[in-house]
């Protein structure tokens, strides 16, 4: 899987590319669910079709590279700044965004770009929490439980997200073995089937590790005593207004935090951190942002945010 994916738009357009960072799954694939984000892209003028790129985690190319750079949100963000300069856009101004942890990483990356003398026009966060307020784990068991809950929530969606890139994935991929995922209806031979199943097992293991390490990065962020200030960057938070089902395995304090955050239109961010900060309500649960029933509204909101940005 390539780290950088061209999602939509004309790479030759004069409009600033929108670079979307993966969520805790490490996958940029959900962004392919978005409709065209350029409102004038259908009039035949390719220059008005903003290029949109998605950034996936390096874990799917090199586990060792992820382990080297994925020790904290700032260290991972620094590696992503290097990747963007090398493979997408060597110089600013930049336009960044991301869903959930992707928005947190986008803010970290914006701070790094600015420290390097670049301009970051805007950061668009899709229901991203300020990691400063994320509660630390009480113990290793809570880390494991939360990581498993998160992994399972992602794994059952993987079939729809990965169908263009991966062999068939079972809906219950988090619990089946490779033998359970046999593709009896394919035209490939047995060797190909075994190889595909091995690739799938590796992929799901990488996904599990990424979620586990991502949760650790969030829960330990407070220990960095990091407070980002971007006085020249505008920020939009697309805020989910619906609370999904809370797992009975969650501790009571986690459930209280989730309910409290739902009522906070800023998701813990402080408006004085940025040149401007706008919160736009989005009628979706956090996990369903890119599901079919929500992606059209999300596209409309993103179009509105982007329409006045060159």
Curated annotation (Swiss-Prot):
Keywords: Hydrolase, Membrane, Transmembrane, Transmembrane helix. The chain crosses the membrane at residues 14-34, 95-115. InterPro entries: AB_hydrolase_fold (IPR029058), Thioesterase (IPR001031). Coiled coil: none annotated. Pfam families: Thioesterase. Pathway: Secondary metabolite biosynthesis. GO terms for cellular component: membrane. Residues 170-184 have a biased composition (Low complexity). Signal peptide: none annotated. This is Thioesterase pytI. The gene is pytI.
């Amino acid at each position: 899987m390539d780290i950088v994916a061209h999602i939509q738009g004309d790479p030759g357009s004069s409009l600033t590319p929108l670079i979307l960072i993966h969520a805790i799954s490490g996958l940029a694939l959900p962004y392919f669910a978005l409709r065209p984000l350029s409102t004038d892209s259908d009039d035949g003028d390719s220059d008005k079709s903003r290029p949109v790129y998605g950034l996936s985690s390096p874990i799917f190319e090199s586990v060792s590279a992820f382990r080297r750079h994925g020790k904290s949100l700032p260290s991972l963000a620094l590696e992503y700044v290097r990747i963007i300069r090398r493979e997408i856009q060597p110089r600013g101004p930049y336009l960044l965004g991301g869903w959930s942890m992707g928005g947190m990483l986008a803010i970290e990356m914006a701070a790094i770009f600015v420290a390097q003398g670049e301009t970051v026009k805007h950061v668009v966060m899709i229901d991203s929490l300020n990691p400063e307020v994320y509660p630390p784990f009480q113990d290793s068991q809570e880390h494991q439980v939360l990581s498993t809950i998160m992994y399972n929530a992602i794994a059952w969606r993987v079939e729809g997200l990965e169908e263009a890139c991966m062999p068939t994935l079972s809906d219950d991929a988090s619990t089946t073995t490779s033998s359970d995922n046999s593709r009896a209806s394919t035209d490939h031979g047995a060797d190909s089937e075994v190889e595909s199943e091995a690739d799938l097992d590796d992929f799901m293991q990488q996904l599990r590790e990424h979620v586990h390490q991502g949760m650790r990065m969030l829960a330990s962020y407070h220990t960095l005593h990091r407070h980002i200030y971007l006085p020249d960057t505008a920020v939009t938070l697309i805020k989910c207004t619906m609370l999904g089902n809370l797992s009975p395995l969650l501790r009571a304090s986690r459930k209280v935090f989730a309910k409290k955050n739902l009522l906070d239109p800023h998701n813990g961010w402080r408006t004085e951190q940025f040149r401007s900060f706008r919160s736009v309500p989005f009628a979706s649960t956090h996990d369903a942002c890119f599901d079919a029933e929500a992606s059209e509204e999300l596209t409309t909101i993103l179009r509105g945010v982007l329409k006045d940005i060159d």
